Amino acid sequence: MKAKEIKALSTTEMLEKEKSYKDELFNLRFQLATGQLENTARLKQVRKNIARIKTALREQELNK
């Protein structure tokens, strides 16, 4: 997701997306440990998406 797309979401939607990305990251790490992960670049993408969401949430918090 792009930062603009994330900022357009509501706070609850952002929290839901963050949770889903964290679940996906857990599964990807598990696949990596067991040698089943084929697309290792996805780990970086998911981590960056989580960081983007956390940044947008913090910006909203500070703007209130």
Swiss-Prot record:
Q: Which InterPro entries match?
A: Ribosomal_protein_uL29, Ribosomal_uL29, Ribosomal_uL29_CS, Ribosomal_uL29_sf
| Keyword set, alphabetical order | Ribonucleoprotein, Ribosomal protein
Q: Does this entry carry the keyword Ribonucleoprotein?
A: yes
Q: Show the Pfam families listed in the entry.
A: Ribosomal_L29
Q: Name one GO cellular component term.
A: cytosolic large ribosomal subunit
Output one GO MF annotation. structural constituent of ribosome
Q: Which GO terms describe its biological process?
A: translation
Q: What is this protein called?
A: Large ribosomal subunit protein uL29
